[in-house]
Amino acid sequence: SEWLKNTDNQRALPRIQWLVDSLDRLKAYAEIAKNLNKTLRINLELDVGLHRGGFANIHALKEALDLAKQYPLLKISGLMAYEAHVAKMPTLLNMQANAWQTVQQMLYQAKQLFTEMGYKPETLTINSGGSQTYTMHAQQSYANEISIGTAFVQPSDFDLPTLSQHQPASFIA
């Protein structure tokens, strides 16, 4: 919250989306917003199978949206669904395709939930990982923003079939 007390940083607030992965964190951001008397844009993290954090399912996401409505200085700006696990799933027995469909189904359900709760999904950031899966997003995706950066330098752990058209940016001996 020290960073937010700086006047120059406060001017950047309308462009920043704060990633929230739990109800406790949502309450903490509400307290910060209240103390500063500033609106904070909140992007909720949905666990779509990686299990590294975020709201575990659509019901938990609804709980967060219900709670956010109680805080006038919190503005829901979107959703983040990190799906880095998908590209590393084996293709055997359609495991990768099934994981991808689960991600897409959860994104679809989240967009429907946003609509039911009075939000316009087309105005929200619906972000997904993208670095290892952007070619899959090009085929089918409910996300409207993906993060690709690391794919273009092709670190060795990104040597995956979904990125086979890339070559490493450099080799360090």
Question: Where are each of the predicted segments found?
Answer:
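Catalytic beta/alpha-barrel core
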Residues: 1, 14-24
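N-terminal active-site wall of soluble small-molecule enzyme domains
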Residues: 1-10
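Short acidic, glycine/Ser/Thr-rich loop/turn "cap" segments at secondary-structure junctions
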Residues: 9-15, 46-50
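Generic beta-strand structural signal
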Residues: 14-18, 38-42, 124
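Short beta->alpha connector loops
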Residues: 22-26, 131-132
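Active-site-adjacent beta->alpha loops and helix N-cap segments on the catalytic face
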Residues: 25-32, 36-37
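Active-site loop/helix belt of alpha/beta enzymes
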Residues: 41, 47-163
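Short, intrinsically disordered, charge-balanced linker/junction segments flanking boundaries
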Residues: 165-173
